[in-house]
Amino acid sequence: IDEENIKVTMADFEKALLEVKPAFGASTTLFERCMLNGMISHGETHEKLVSTMESLIEQVRVSEKTPMLTCLLEGSAGTGKTALSAALAIKSQFPFTKLFSPDTFVGAPEAKKCADLAKLFDDAYKSPVSLIVLDDIERLLEYVDVGPRFSNVILQALLVLLKRQPPP
């Protein structure tokens, strides 16, 4: 290889940019995978829920009195809670949107999950507005119906992180 004749062109630079995944920002790929079949309206109640969620997102975007808002979607498995959250995250166009799913932590110890949760929230604080989707909280907490058993360490971390106000 003739090192003196190696040249990096703008095309090379642009190609490299396509390969880079930003540490911050809105990564819509994971959210898009959560709604492969799109969103289907399930009537008036569903539309009211979507409207309420969009209002909450807008409130966080424009209100100085609401630096943080926590919302829980509860329902049976397979009813579209994750898909709805993903659609709203994409639609929000917030500069920082992330999905935190137990799928990425198979076999990970509690300490790693807690550390990654804390880092996620710390990263979110660096953006003017952020949206974090905590998917499948029961699995994240390692909840088991029989017993019942769950990870108190992860629960305590979530309780602290979900209540802690962002720094000014």
Regions flagged by a language model, labelled:
Residues 1-143, 150-168:
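AAA+ P-loop ATPase motor domain of ring mechanoenzymes
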